[in-house]
Structures are given as structure tokens and as C-alpha cells.
């Protein structure tokens, strides 16, 4: 009986905690005006995510082969400086690092990238940024290319009932923590409607420094 009572109390406390967190999440979402779905345009078929890990070098020469002939691309960071950029014509471009929104030590390289995007993009392309940085990005990038569409992502962190998490993710009202831009591009790929997603250059070194004594 005691175990049953403890279990009931534990469940009640869990429901109470989730209710408070969920209410706080809704209040934050409403007051920060983050009620829009970033993914009003839907896509289908295959998409290849091209991150900037070392293994991408092996893939770059193959991007114009038949394997990728019916594939859309999502790229990130400085991919616009790659020679293959204007040949594969990516539909999606993700930027999450603050260096793309504010003056910084890499400002020269960033300005060069924006110049390339303004000058060379002659196809329709979406650029995705966190919603909190979109105004800074508009000013800092000074992009005026009519082919480029800016899409702001609701980066508010979901809190509350676990069963509702994916509803808010699916409708673009929240997203997983963008600890790396790779998280952002995977989120964009899955929420854009594609049935198949290929990952290239999504490498990490999280465990390289770990060892067992």
C-alpha cells in the first residue's frame, strides 16, 4: 500500500511539474510572438545535408553525379565559398553562429560570403536563422538578392508534457537545442517534408578526449 501511495504521489508531482513548465512555455511563446510556423513551404523527395566535417571532402567531387541528380541540398556556414556551390544550387542554407549576425574577428570572411550570395545566387534559396537574430542578420548581411528568402526559426525550448513535444516541433513552434548548426539543419530537413534525408560531413569530436583509466 505504501509503495502504491508513493507511486501516486510521484505521478502527481510529475504532472504538477509538467503543468507548470508547459504553462511557462506557452507564456514565453505568446509574449515573444513566436506563434508562426516557419515551414509553410513543403518539399518532397530526397535532401542531402552537407555539413562541414572533414568527411565532406570525400563527397564534394561526387555531388554532380547521378546519385544526387534528383536531390535537394541543405548547406551551412561557409559552403557558399565552395566551387561546387553554384553548380548544385542548394535550396536551403542554415546559419546559426553569431559571427553571421554581428561584427567579429571573422568579419572579412563573412562579408565575402554575403557578397557571393548576393552576386551568384540565381535560383530560389531559403536562408534559415534563429528568430532572435533575424533583424541583426538583415542589417549585418545587407542581402538584397530577390532569389533569397529569409526564414526565421522558433528556437524557443519546449518544456512540459513529453507527449506534446513533437507536436510543437512538427509545427515549427519549438525546436531542439541548436548546440551545433548540424542540429539545426537536421531539424530543417525533417520539418520541410522530405521523405529521405542523407547526412554528409556530420562529424563530431565529442568523445575524442575521453579515456578510461
Range-by-range predicted roles:
Residues 2-213:
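Metal-ion/cofactor- or nucleotide/acyl-coenzyme-handling active-site neighborhoods
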Amino acid at each position: 500500500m505504501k509503495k502504491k501511495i508513493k507511486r501516486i504521489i510521484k505521478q502527481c508531482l510529475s504532472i504538477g511539474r509538467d503543468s507548470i513548465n508547459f504553462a511557462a512555455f506557452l507564456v514565453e511563446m505568446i509574449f515573444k510572438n513566436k506563434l508562426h510556423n516557419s515551414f509553410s513551404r513543403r518539399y518532397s523527395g530526397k535532401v542531402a545535408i552537407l555539413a562541414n566535417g572533414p568527411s565532406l571532402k570525400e563527397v564534394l567531387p561526387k555531388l554532380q553525379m547521378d546519385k544526387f541528380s534528383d536531390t535537394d541540398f541543405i548547406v551551412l556556414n561557409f559552403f557558399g565559398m565552395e566551387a561546387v556551390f553554384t553548380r548544385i544550387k542548394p535550396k536551403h542554407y542554415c546559419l546559426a553562429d553569431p559571427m553571421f549576425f554581428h561584427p567579429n574577428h571573422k568579419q572579412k570572411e563573412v562579408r565575402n560570403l554575403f557578397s557571393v550570395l548576393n552576386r551568384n545566387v540565381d535560383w530560389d534559396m531559403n536562408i534559415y536563422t534563429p528568430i532572435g537574430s533575424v533583424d541583426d542578420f538583415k542589417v549585418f548581411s545587407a542581402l538584397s538578392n530577390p532569389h533569397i528568402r529569409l526564414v526565421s526559426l522558433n528556437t524557443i525550448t519546449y518544456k512540459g508534457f513529453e507527449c506534446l513535444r513533437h507536436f510543437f516541433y512538427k509545427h515549427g513552434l519549438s525546436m531542439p537545442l541548436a548546440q551545433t548548426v548540424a542540429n539545426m539543419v537536421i531539424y530543417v530537413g525533417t520539418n520541410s517534408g522530405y521523405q529521405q534525408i542523407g547526412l554528409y560531413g556530420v562529424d563530431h569530436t565529442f568523445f575524442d578526449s575521453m579515456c578510461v583509466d
